[in-house]
């Protein structure tokens, strides 16, 4: 393990966390933590202003990356994202060096064991845990480029997914669209899915998903692909899409086409105010629903394909 890591702090509106995390992963980030931003007591807020909640991303990169080049690349990615994330400030970030053990300890302060539903457990490697016989335990490590399951969009998906496996064996064929680090795909396999396919447009994300599947002992059940959604076969028992509302809406015909009759469609990454955009896009497509779950400013829509 590297003795030192490069750390960049980025202030991000809450609604843009997933997009910024994705771009940092593409740049080669080895880990990201999210912290609440303390308010500046010397600034009197305008009561009429619509100020989005902001969070601090602490992004860690391997020490062999050249710092000045990294700072420029991060600034370029933020400039590209600025039109998509209202309130995102485009600055050239300062880079600091932190000890590897300091990063790991920072991770440990923020994440503990999470139980999602009656069977799924997310366990950091440093936490001792005695699982029940029916538990599906997903193990995380601070050195893994892996979502923690604590972000609302991911947690809503995990909750909806876990409910499908309350009584084993549960759905067997699962498609995870925009798999990213693979946390949803790995969870599905651990819960009992026999065949899980993750697809993503990012080659790095696909490799990370495979690494995480291997780490959790489900590599035989999971495949990943860069192939476009429209080229994939259908008849999946579950289709997961934790992507932006606009992408869910745009991909509506293809997502529904991938579902087997009676299959479950779980859509997340949707801001509350964009629920209707997604609902309208999936109307009239032979679906029952949606069942809507909400956490903070995020929504998750669940449909069943009519037989």
From Swiss-Prot:
InterPro entries with a match to the protein in the record: Ribosomal_L11_MeTrfase_PrmA (IPR050078), Ribosomal_PrmA_MeTrfase (IPR004498), SAM-dependent_MTases_sf (IPR029063)
Keywords: Cytoplasm, Methyltransferase, S-adenosyl-L-methionine, Transferase
Gene3D superfamilies: Vaccinia Virus protein VP39
Binding site for S-adenosyl-L-methionine: 154, 178, 200, 242
EC id: 2.1.1.-
Catalytic activity: L-lysyl-[protein] + 3 S-adenosyl-L-methionine = N(6),N(6),N(6)-trimethyl-L-lysyl-[protein] + 3 S-adenosyl-L-homocysteine + 3 H(+)
Xref: Pfam families: PrmA
Subcellular location: Cytoplasm
A molecular function (GO) term: protein-lysine N-methyltransferase activity
Origin: domain of life: Bacteria
Function of the protein: Methylates ribosomal protein L11.
Family to which the UniProt record says this protein belongs: Belongs to the methyltransferase superfamily. PrmA family.
HAMAP family: Methyltr_PrmA (MF_00735)
Listed name of the protein: Ribosomal protein L11 methyltransferase
Gene name for this UniProt entry: prmA
